[in-house]
Amino acid sequence: MAVPKKRTSISKKRIRNTLWKKKGYFTTLKAFSLAQSIFTGNSKSFFCNKYKR
């Protein structure tokens, strides 16, 4: 069974954690931006039906 030889330093752990958090942050920004463009009707890369009431 594979076992790590040395303990991961606190700074390395922090760096990895912030990268992991930033990844999620940018994903939410992209999703919000896409939702906004669909809602306003400015989306050119996403096709959706427009309902008229």
UniProtKB/Swiss-Prot annotation:
It is found in: Plastid, Chloroplast. One of its GO terms (molecular function) is structural constituent of ribosome. This is Large ribosomal subunit protein bL32c. One of its GO terms (biological process) is translation. PANTHER family: 50S RIBOSOMAL PROTEIN L32, CHLOROPLASTIC (PTHR36083), LARGE RIBOSOMAL SUBUNIT PROTEIN BL32C (PTHR36083:SF1). Keywords: Chloroplast, Plastid, Ribonucleoprotein, Ribosomal protein. Pfam families: Ribosomal_L32p. One of its GO terms (cellular component) is large ribosomal subunit. It comes from the Eukaryota. Belongs to the bacterial ribosomal protein bL32 family.
